[in-house]
Amino acid sequence: MGRVAVDLYAEQIGSALADAQTFRKYLGGCAGNIAVGVARLGLRSAMLSCVGQDEMGVFVTQTLKNEGVVTDLLRATPDHLTGLVLLGVDPPEHFPLMFYRQNCADMQLQPGDCDEQFFRQSKALLVTGTGFSTSAMRATSHHALDLAKTTHTAVVLDIDYRPVLWGLTTLGDGERRYQLADEVSHQYQQILPKCDLIVGTEEEILIAGGDDILSQALDNIHRLVSAPIVVKTGAKGCRIYLKGQREPLTAEPFQVTVLNVLGAGDGFMSGFLSGWLKNAPWQTCMQYANACGAMVVSRHGCAPAMPNNEELEYFLQHSDAQENILQGRNIARRHRRSTLGSAADREMFVFVFDHREQFRSSCEVTDNSRAVVKAFRQQLFSGFQLALQQDPQSRLAMLVDPGYGRTDIASHIDKRVTVGVPIEKAPSLPVRWLGDKPLYQEILQRPAPWFVKVLWEYHPKLDEQIQRQQLLRLKELAGVCDQLDRRLMVELVIPNEYTDLGSATSNAMSAVYQHAIYPFWWNIAGDFSTTRWRALANILERNDPHSRMILSCREQSEVAALGPLFTSAKASEKVSGFVIGWSIFWQAWQRLLKNEIELEEVPKVIAEDFLQCIRLWQEA
């Protein structure tokens, strides 16, 4: 319960906010970050707050849902904007913040937003100190605490003290973390008796305890409540003060290179709760908390920096043995599952009409104009939409041409549809990138949810220098996709005349992984046996278990002939869909050029054939 907003993080490291040129947009706010953090660590998390009925509110809500956070108690208000924060990264000491939160949405919660039945289903309620900084929110927050007690829901307090949000500093001084104020201490001391766990920095303990001497502040708190007090001490780790025990419990910190301390406390809290709510020993809770905090401080952003269970486990197992472990590929690959999701969760049926060269050549032969191609592609898109209407349950995707009609199509794409756009100039060997812009800029300007597809040739008969260039280009592309959080589909091309297509495919995939390149999807063509598909699946299992193969049907001329191909591919659990285009639309294109069908007839033909392909897959 509490702050959930949008963080705009300066991308220029070591720069004052005044000099920042570009910003990355993330979900933020103390409570929002923790909701994401605990969800990534396997807890069932829900968000009790408000967002504005604005585009940023849509972003916050959708991001929470994507992270697995329940949003049933997240209300949208038409009268208030979603809060914004500008953040700078100037390590090791300066991390400026500017809060744009005047009368913002997440401070508009009402007592009626606290659903008693939902509370009864919940093991704990986490509240943050900012929720008590205004009179209206104070009343709602106390109502929530009282309801938690009635429903036997544990109360966790993240002190989360920001002087600027209590009106104690100028509006631009968001970086200040500590300023003694008797009235603020008084408000915190109304909260403390209702808490079962209290977490804060040393400075926050001082303000909650109403004293500038830590030991006295701790005593003051424990006179009000018996709850354990967890004190975050940054690079020194943490301490737990239990009432009646003179010496605190301590745990060793993890030594990492600090990039950004903002959000570290939220990572710490997420890790601590992942142990505490499962009744883990105090040492385990502290170990999880210190590890999660350490991982977050090494990254840009707050919510997106939160680790998942797989990362946490790997970090705890290997942090002593591997120097700079957080900059290594093993952690990065595991973290990517949180930022991009898992391909295992995305069975896809992809309709592709990005055959640029084929259409261009066809127009030259038949003396038709580009306008004819554009009109035909619009009908292909209409056919895809018709298929989507008739089969709304399947996950349909489309791969669109970056030139012909992309802008027109993009404005009409249903949000349920996964969209990809090629990045390569086809044909090109070594692979060359589309457009005149640098690769980073080209991908940056595309909608963020769209995936990147590259047609990439690699096999042992290529000259060794070409092989090296292909791998270097692919590594460059994968690096840009990682920086921009874009999913990468590698469409592996091996010539038809290759005598052992299965071995060549295995060798190419292995070479990619040996160069620390991890595609989200592999687009694989081949009429392979079930044994070969399983061998390819083993390569994924060894190198990147969350990646998946998508079967390419580019060599098939008849839809009806796809059944046996689908059956073989589905013998492997690592194949999660198919890509098809030519087999569906090329005959219609040829018939259109010969005036054998009208343009308006194309959508029905396309939809019927695409849906038949989906049925064949589901029956295989």
Task: Describe the role of every protein-language-model region.
Residues 146-150, 210-330:
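Conserved phosphate-binding/catalytic region of the ribokinase-like
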Residues 397-401, 450-470, 501, 508-532:
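Catalytic beta/alpha-barrel core
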Residues 351, 491, 522, 581:
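Conserved, mostly hydrophobic/aromatic
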